[in-house]
Swiss-Prot record:
Name of this protein: Large ribosomal subunit protein bL19
Gene Ontology MF annotations: structural constituent of ribosome
One of the Pfam families matching this protein, by short name: Ribosomal_L19
Lineage, opening ranks: Bacteria, Bacillati, Mycoplasmatota, Mycoplasmoidales, Mycoplasmoidaceae
Similarity field: Belongs to the bacterial ribosomal protein bL19 family.
Function: This protein is located at the 30S-50S ribosomal subunit interface and may play a role in the structure and function of the aminoacyl-tRNA binding site.
Signal peptide positions (record): none
Organism of this sequence: Ureaplasma parvum serovar 3 (strain ATCC 700970)
Record's GO cellular component terms: cytosolic large ribosomal subunit
One BP annotation, GO: translation
Annotated keywords: Ribonucleoprotein, Ribosomal protein
Recorded name of the encoding gene: rplS
InterPro entries: Ribosomal_bL19, Ribosomal_bL19_CS, Ribosomal_bL19_sf, Translation_prot_SH3-like_sf
């Protein structure tokens, strides 16, 4: 007979909350951000910047992810980042955009002027 009942969910929440970053800026889909990502190649490591529009921010806690899309040489490039990963050094918000959806997948079919997003003046 067990004297104490162990709640595994509470233990997992406690462990996850200790590993969360506190310097994450407030951003949503449609915003333009720069993600400073640490890349390890052999014994060397460097920081690579990835600037683009946030297509989706999803999840909560330590499993929160963001999909960022940019257009490089006329080709669309998307990359998914775990926000609280130790490989993500810093996230900067460049512009705040106004969109009406949480997941703006329709941006994948657009390029040029049709891919513009209305800018918000947030401070």
């Amino acid at each position: 007979m067990a004297l104490f009942k162990i709640n595994k969910g509470e233990i997992m929440n406690f462990v996850n909350s200790t590993q969360l970053k506190t310097d994450i800026p407030n951003f949503d889909s449609g915003d333009t951000i720069i993600v400073h990502n640490r890349i390890v190649e052999g014994k060397k490591s460097r920081i690579q910047k990835f600037e683009g529009v946030v297509l989706r921010r999803r999840g909560s806690g330590s499993s929160e992810t963001v999909i960022v899309r940019k257009e490089s040489s006329g080709i669309g490039v998307e990359q998914s980042f775990n926000i609280h990963s130790p490989l993500v050094e810093k996230i900067e918000v460049i512009k705040y955009g106004k969109v009406r959806r949480a997941y703006i997948s329709y941006m994948r079919n657009r390029s040029g002027k049709s891919a513009r997003i209305k800018e918000l003046n947030k401070q």
